[in-house]
Amino acid sequence: MAETTATPTQPVEKVSDVIKNYRPAKAFRGNPKADKQVNVTSLDFDDQGDYLVASGEDEMIQVFDVKEGKATKTVPSKKYGVHLARFTHHSRQILHASTKLDDSLRLLDLHNESYLRYFTGHTDKVVSLAVSPGTDAFLSCSKDDTVAFWDLNSRNAQGKLKLATPYLAAFDPSGSVIAIASQSTSFVLLYDFRNYDKAPFASFDLSPLEDRYTPTTKGRAWTRLEFSNDGKSLLIGTDYHGHFVLDAFEGNLKAFLVGKHGPTGRAAPVSTTGKSLGQGDVCLTPDGRYAIGGSGEQPDTLVWDLHQPPDAKLFLEPMTRLPYYRSRTTLAQANPRYNMFATADKEIVFWLPEDPTKMAEK
């Protein structure tokens, strides 16, 4: 792939004006020093969109400068393993889950490459991490069937919920509402974050939707839970058939996103197959209008326009397929500030909108 020196620009252009023009601008191996390529397992941007952090099966944490388009730091985590690397609201601090030794969460200072704090309390693997958009609070979901509520300034959990397979969690944009997905029961539960010890104020039963749209993977394929930035939609990504977009207030299905061809090859949190870890192959753009995701076993990246009406059965086809030939998309993450997004499988790819006139020349 020909690399470009183009850097992301602030979104003075509407996403709708450039969404069809995104092309791979730069690709990075998960770990350039490794003998062979390994799977990347998580991606996350900092609040300002200036840095991307990635974790991989090689137990390395990599940080990339988005503007410069280069890797700036690699930190090994061989002792504990690493998954779900997330920026706090400080771009020099990384929160991540452990994959071996114990099931603690760890807060890493990138400046001196040392751990500031361990968060202990889970007794099985952590499969989802959600950071509050406005405070130092965060949530963790574990295979011990608990959701733990934390503050970055304390090593002990502020509270816990015991639920059946609560393997995905997300904050709404205000930070006042949390969604928790219980895969085995096919429910999504909404809680007031300040009163999470009370009963959920809403619960959405997706069992009828799974029977209709994902019958062969019912109860075992949810991979992503994300609110749109306007708080009106809730995305539930799945590993195989497609993705659900719900009305975040009523739980009604807005659309089922189709167009994937086969699974991503990554394990859903509920899975016991031993497949490589991931965080879902679909995400929402910051304007809330588009979903970007993988096409399963094919290398193209799909884009769905959520403002377009679905068909009578609520199926929504991709508005475009963004071409790539070197690897498929098993992870996808949109930059919160700039017109760019990142995807990954065994390599990490930065996508930028290309000049339409140059595209025509090609």
Predicted regions and their residues:
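WD40-repeat beta-propeller superdomains and closely related acidic/aromatic-rich repeat-like regions
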Residues: M1-K362
